[in-house]
Amino acid sequence: ATFSPTPKPSPTPTPPDLVDSYAVQGAEVASHQSDTMHWRIERIEQEGAVCYLTKIYLLDPGTQIRKATANWERDIQYPVDMAAKIPDATLFINGSGYVSPTFPEIPSNYPGSSPDYYYTPLGSVTVTDGQLFRCLTGVPYYGLSLTRDGLHMHVGDDPADVLAANPTQTWSFYIECPVIRDHQSILDPNWRFTTAPAMRTIISCIDEHNFILLTVTRDGSSALTMRQCVDYLQSAFDPLWTYNLDGGPSIALYYRLSPDDDWVRVAGGTSKDADIMAFAD
């Protein structure tokens, strides 16, 4: 009898790193590349606003995207202080918007009153390092979740469905903050930030391994409205989805070329936040 050797399984192809392939190129601020990660921060001017584009490739986003937080219900912290909790990160941005005596608004469908939520993120689900801090049953979730298979955006999902995927982290803000879904704008034309120029931190997912961060500053003659940001991201990158993280004085963009280096501030970082999103090798 003739026996054919069992064919070896094909190796899983390495997903493409798109950092160098986008048509839009700004002036390089810094870049970092390793076997598992590639990012480059670029300075651009868009409609009079000085902005930073951070192009990111991650081999395994489910483990390389990280979160650090302030103390639940007790305080908010400077982003660079929270980053000290993630020693292997080389890049971070600010994360969730939060409730405080200064920003006390909570949605009308949240149980309780604003002081019940002080110094915690907006959003009906909060998970940090796999630990559940909040689940408002029946209150739709508008935010991000990180699971073993990567980063996901939720647009009004049931908290039970979000938690069923066993997220390790969440980040969230206003219900209007998912602004692009399935390559289409879902920006609410009546949201006050749609037409108000502001400093912003926005994350776009190109595919499961490639992301674009847009950091909008007030260093130029103007900031950008959310409509300007969405139009720009769609025309330049056509993202799968886009989510608006905390903005205004809360923006932060920092990098370091190795975990042994001190953090370098690119933008923001001067106000305290509830949490950060970091990227590690």
Predicted regions and their residues:
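Extracellular mucin-like PTS domains
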Residues: 2-14
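Zymogen propeptides
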Residues: 11-137, 143
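Beta-strand-turn-beta hairpins that frame and shape the catalytic cleft
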Residues: 46-51, 149-150, 205-212
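Short, solvent-exposed aromatic-acidic interface loops
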Residues: 69-74, 157-162, 215-221
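A short, polar/proline- and glycine-enriched secondary-structure boundary/capping micro-motif
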Residues: 75-77, 162-169, 222-230
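Active-site neighborhood of phospho(di)ester-bond hydrolases with catalytic His/Asp-centered motifs
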Residues: 92-95, 242-246
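Active-site-adjacent helix-turn-beta-strand microarchitecture at beta-sheet edges
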Residues: 101-192
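Conserved, well-ordered active-site substructure
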Residues: 103-136, 188-243, 250-281
